[in-house]
Amino acid sequence: MNSLLYALIKALRCHRWLRLLACAFIFSSLGNGLTQVVVFGLLLAWSAPPALLTLAFLFATVPGFIGSTIGEKLCSRWSPISLLILTEGLGLLALLFPLLGVGYHSVAALLAVQSTEALLSGMSWPALTLLFKRGLSEAELPAATCLENVIFASQVLLGTGLGVVLFQKTSVFTLLAIDAASFLGSLLMLWLAGRRFSAPSLPSSGEEEASAALRWRTLTVRQKRSLLLLPSLAAVGSPAMALLPALAQQIHPQDAAGLALPLLFARSMGQLCGPMLLKKESLTRFAAHTPRIIVCLGIFLASYGTLPLLSGWMACALGAIFIAHLASNILFAAGTFGVLSSFHLTQTASASGKAWRWQTLSASLFTGIAAAVAAGFGSVAALYAVSSAALVMVALIVRRYRE
């Protein structure tokens, strides 16, 4: 019973604030997933070109760079719970954008809600990581890693799952009303979690500033690898994930939305199940073993590469996406655990913010390249060329920083 799932269940039984926090983010993820269904479903229904579909993914990542910087700074002044409540409240207000998009048939408004969600996600990531570091013991950190993956996966597992069922059976306004209710539920759960959480005394501002100044030359090899794992995953994974709606449009133009949304659901199932295959003790060893990293990324890319060949085989296409994200989220779990376990408490917010920004830059760069290639040569060629080049680059980088 050393799996990450067992570690999470044990931690949830010990900490009431953690149970409330988990409920809050499940509510929030439900709303975020519904928002994604509305955005991509409308773009597909409006027959948006492949380059625009890919840029929609880009707009959902780039503002996270700014958000993580803001979140990192606010973590030194606000409690993590207060910052999380702020981001959820702003997320509720951001639902005005899709309302405008539907009312005025505005693609810009749909992209604006993607950008706002990315900004708020970037703000919340350092706060969430710092909250785990303060509230959990070192032995319980694998539980935090598992919970982060559950939060990440439930966005599509719950939100997109419900959206797949309801998108073509109910109005967009009904979906947005459910979305708003989920944000209100999240705000309530976060407020209750804040009342139950008791943090240790904070370090002095001078000590925190000194500790939080992360300089690359002074970091250990393990710390450097921890910061590089998530950007490496983004370099290989983001082009493929961004091209997924466009691939569906190219493979099955008669019913692109009917194919793309189940593929997104299969993606989330893989994201949820992948970390459950790991044991607590294997997290550190996995992050330090370069061949395992390359194998996971290779499985991810190979699975996506088979999609153009599976146009008439829906079940096989869903299975390929499931396997791809099973592999990628094993690596995601190793990366998030590395940031949590490799840095001191006063460095956690800075380290997680830096990892998020590097991940955002990596995703933005390679997604932008994929969009340009897709516009000129098609989404299939973009998938093979960009993600393969990224995989070679990642292999060279992780080999350079071997432990």
Region spans (language model):
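Cytoplasmic helix-loop-helix junction between adjacent transmembrane helices
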Residues: 113-154
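Juxtamembrane intracellular "pre-TM" segments in multi-pass secondary transporters
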Residues: 1-18, 196-228
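Helix-loop junctions on the cytosolic side of multi-pass membrane transporters
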Residues: 176-204, 399-403
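Intracellular juxtamembrane helix-capping segments at the cytosolic ends
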Residues: 39, 123-136, 330-343
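A single, central transmembrane helix in multi-pass transporters
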Residues: 26, 33-38, 172-174, 215-275
